[in-house]
């Protein structure tokens, strides 16, 4: 067992609750001790929605431990069924309450006798899966449940829609810029003359799941959520799916060409090449910007990328292929899908890191000293400590990455947003230098940022003054090189002589 003060992907029950609370009129009952029930607070704080989070905690306390949980859990399910009239109630334990080894499936069967809506137990192993895997499995389970139910009743649609249509699978609550991506994907589909049949799970009704087979194909924009469902629909109903994430000019074009291929295979005659050309050359600013002098200033600059599989792979490709930036390290915390990630990014970066240990990533960033980091909220903290700018490109994220303004990452507008984020993340050296020289408005003294948060070396007055004369955008590097030299030679105080010796040693 490992103590972690930062987790990139949460425990399994968070994934299940994300799916349940994404659907319309679905309620979740969480069988958990106090302390595991933070999902309501987290979602209410982060998602900018007016509705309450439809999750109730059935608390495991000493009375429950003494008498067993059945009575309390069944009562809570039946009570919520009467109060809220949900279409579906999903019961989920947490990793803590799983220790009790109770027969929750039996509780669900018992509650179903008295409940008017459907009741389901989330079928997830809480010790084997994390938040992302559990979300994928829960979505698959709900879709399968309702399609099988419709099949028994003979309610499945027998024909496809007349016009080409798509199901967008994987848009969920608490996802990284998911709502914005959904809007952009709907626009993209409209531009291509494709109707959106269903978007699941966000805002979907479980009663509409029976309509999923009407679509011509499925689009899975995020690798973490939706692949299991798309695989099931392909196996049962012969529905093809596109799992190319449309992020960046190149990948968006590849995604559209794959859609064209699937639609034409079903009898339509579409040609999207003119649309791709028009968008790439004239509508999206990213292709033009990447050839401008501003972007050429970034050529060869070093960057580190870290995040979930989808976003880390997409950003790595954009940096290397479309902007000429040198990616020294690309990493993901999705260890369960590491082979796919390696295959996607290995030709675009020097080093691949598969880890969910934030200290390992922090150490790698400190060792590589990139000009910018593109990562999660945690890499932002690391960047602040090391004085390296960071653009946030993947979950886990905090409130500032749930923007009110329109900021998609997918599609052609997404490429503009990503390009802005990348360019603005690199510190413009001259700007930094001028601020230091002139001190800005009403600044009494120049503020110097220390790089080492816990440096064990002392700088004497003369050496500190000399260090302050070094331009801000290289000062961090000079300080780190000098301290490294001092440690290797056994100096505890850094003087001017030590500084000059260090400078000679690194050949600067």
Swiss-Prot record:
Matches recorded under NCBIfam families: DPOR_BchB
EC number: 1.3.7.7
Subunit and interaction comment: Protochlorophyllide reductase is composed of three subunits; ChlL, ChlN and ChlB. Forms a heterotetramer of two ChlB and two ChlN subunits.
Pathway assignment: Porphyrin-containing compound metabolism; chlorophyll biosynthesis (light-independent)
Membrane-spanning segments: none
Protein name in UniProt: Light-independent protochlorophyllide reductase subunit B
Domain of life: Bacteria
Binding-site list for substrate: 429-430
Residues annotated to bind [4Fe-4S] cluster: 36
Primary enzyme class: oxidoreductase
Family membership noted in the UniProt record: Belongs to the ChlB/BchB/BchZ family.
Matches recorded under Gene3D superfamilies: 1.20.89.20, Nitrogenase molybdenum iron protein domain, Proto-chlorophyllide reductase 57 kD subunit B
GO MF annotation list: 4 iron, 4 sulfur cluster binding; ATP binding; metal ion binding; oxidoreductase activity, acting on iron-sulfur proteins as donors; oxidoreductase activity, acting on the CH-CH group of donors, iron-sulfur protein as acceptor
Swiss-Prot/TrEMBL catalytic activity: chlorophyllide a + oxidized 2[4Fe-4S]-[ferredoxin] + 2 ADP + 2 phosphate = protochlorophyllide a + reduced 2[4Fe-4S]-[ferredoxin] + 2 ATP + 2 H2O
InterPro entries in the record: ChlB/BchB/BchZ, LI-POR_suB-like_C, Nase/OxRdtase_comp1, P-CP_red_C, Protochl_reductB, Protochlorophyllide_Rdtase
Gene: chlB
Alphabetical GO biological process terms: light-independent chlorophyll biosynthetic process; photosynthesis, dark reaction
Cofactor, how bound (note): Binds 1 [4Fe-4S] cluster per heterodimer. The cluster is bound at the heterodimer interface by residues from both subunits.
Keywords on record: 4Fe-4S, ATP-binding, Chlorophyll biosynthesis, Iron, Iron-sulfur, Metal-binding, Nucleotide-binding, Oxidoreductase, Photosynthesis
Active site residues of this protein: 294
Cofactor names: [4Fe-4S] cluster
Purpose: Component of the dark-operative protochlorophyllide reductase (DPOR) that uses Mg-ATP and reduced ferredoxin to reduce ring D of protochlorophyllide (Pchlide) to form chlorophyllide a (Chlide). This reaction is light-independent. The NB-protein (ChlN-ChlB) is the catalytic component of the complex.
């Amino acid at each position: 067992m490992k103590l972690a003060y930062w987790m990139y992907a949460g425990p399994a029950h968070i994934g299940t609750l994300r799916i349940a609370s994404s659907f319309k009129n679905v309620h979740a009952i969480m069988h958990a001790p106090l302390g595991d029930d933070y999902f309501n607070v987290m979602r209410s704080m982060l998602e900018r929605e007016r509705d309450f989070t439809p999750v109730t905690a059935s608390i495991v306390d000493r009375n429950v431990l003494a008498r067993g949980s059945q009575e309390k859990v069944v009562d809570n399910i039946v009570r919520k069924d009467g109060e809220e009239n949900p279409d579906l109630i999903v019961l989920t334990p947490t990793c803590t309450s799983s220790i009790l080894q109770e027969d929750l499936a039996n509780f669900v069967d018992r509650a179903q006798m008295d409940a008017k809506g459907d009741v389901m137990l989330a079928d997830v192993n809480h010790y084997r899966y994390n938040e992302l895997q559990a979300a994928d499995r829960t979505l698959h389970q709900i879709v399968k449940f309702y399609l099988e139910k419709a099949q028994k009743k003979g309610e499945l649609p027998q024909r496809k829609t007349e016009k080409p249509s798509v199901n967008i699978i994987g848009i969920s609550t608490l996802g990284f810029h998911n709502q914005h991506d959904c809007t952009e994907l709907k626009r993209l589909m409209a531009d291509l003359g494709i109707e959106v049949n269903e978007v699941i799970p966000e805002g979907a009704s479980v009663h509409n799941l029976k309509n999923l087979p009407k679509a011509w194909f499925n689009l899975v924009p995020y690798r973490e959520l939706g692949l299991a469902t798309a695989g099931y629909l392909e196996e049962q109903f012969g529905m093809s799916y596109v799992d190319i994430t449309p992020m960046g000019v190149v990948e968006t074009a590849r995604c559209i060409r794959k859609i064209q291929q699937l639609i034409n295979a079903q009898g339509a005659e579409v040609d999207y090449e003119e649309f791709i050309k028009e968008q790439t050359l004239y509508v999206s600013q990213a292709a033009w910007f990447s050839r401008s002098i501003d972007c050429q200033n970034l050529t060869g600059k070093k960057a580190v990328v870290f995040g979930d599989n989808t976003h880390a792979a997409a950003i790595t490709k954009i940096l290397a292929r479309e902007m000429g930036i040198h990616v020294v390290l690309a990493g993901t915390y999705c260890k369960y899908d590491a082979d796919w990630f390696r295959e996607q990014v290995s030709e675009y970066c020097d080093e691949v890191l598969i880890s969910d240990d934030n200290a390992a990533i922090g150490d790698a960033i400190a060792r590589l000293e990139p000009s910018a980091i593109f990562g999660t909220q945690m890499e932002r903290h690391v960047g602040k400590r090391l004085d390296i700018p960071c653009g946030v490109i993947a979950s886990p994220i905090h409130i500032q990455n749930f923007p009110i303004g329109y900021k998609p990452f997918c599609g052609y507008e997404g490429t503009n947003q990503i390009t802005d984020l990348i360019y603005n993340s690199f510190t413009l050296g001259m700007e930094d230098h001028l601020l230091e020289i002139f001190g800005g408005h009403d600044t009494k003294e120049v503020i110097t940022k220390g790089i080492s948060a816990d440096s064990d070396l002392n700088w004497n007055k003369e050496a500190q003054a000399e260090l302050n004369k070094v331009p801000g955008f290289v000062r961090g590097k000079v300080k780190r090189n000098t301290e490294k030299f001092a440690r290797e030679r056994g100096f505890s105080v850094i003087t001017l002589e030590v500084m000059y010796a260090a400078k000679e040693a690194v050949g600067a």
